Amino acid sequence: MQLFETEHAKYLHQTIQRMQVQRAAVQASGLPALKRLVVAAQRSSGQSAVVGRFLLGLYNGPTYPFTLTELRGLDQELHSDCMAVLLMDWSPEREVHEMIEGGHHIFQSLIARWA
C-alpha cells in the first residue's frame, strides 16, 4: 500500500509540474494576444465589433453571449489571438479584465461600445 501511495504522490507531483509549465507557456502567448485584441476592439471596424463581443463573452458570458461563428469573420492574426486568449481563459488565475492594466475601465468602455 505504501508503494502505491508513493507512486501516486510522485505522479501527482509530476502532473502539477507539467501543468505549471503549460500554464506559463499559455500565459506567455495569451497575455500579448489579449493586449492586441483590446487594441483591435477599441477600433471602428467589423472585426473590432467581433473582437469586442468575444472579449465581453469571456468577461461575462451569461450577460454578453458570443456566437462562435462570428470568429469566421476575423483575419488569421486576430483569430489566432482569440484562440490564445480563450486557451488562457480556460483555467484562469484571474478574470480576463484583471489581466491587463486598467482592465476594469477598458471593459466598461467595451460594454458601452459593443454590448
Describe the residue ranges of each PLM region.
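Polybasic, proline/glycine-rich intrinsically disordered low-complexity segments
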Residues: T67-A115
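Short terminal alpha-helical segments
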Residues: E5-S45
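Substrate-binding/catalytic groove segments of enzymes
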Residues: Q47, P62-F66
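Non-catalytic, well-ordered alpha-helical scaffold segments
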Residues: L31, K35, S48-L56, S80
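Membrane-embedded hydrophobic alpha-helical segments
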Residues: M1-L3
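Short, hydrophobic/amphipathic alpha-helical patches that form generic packing surfaces
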Residues: V50-G61, A84, M88
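Short, flexible helical or helix-coil boundary motifs
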Residues: M19, A41, P62, D89-E93, ...
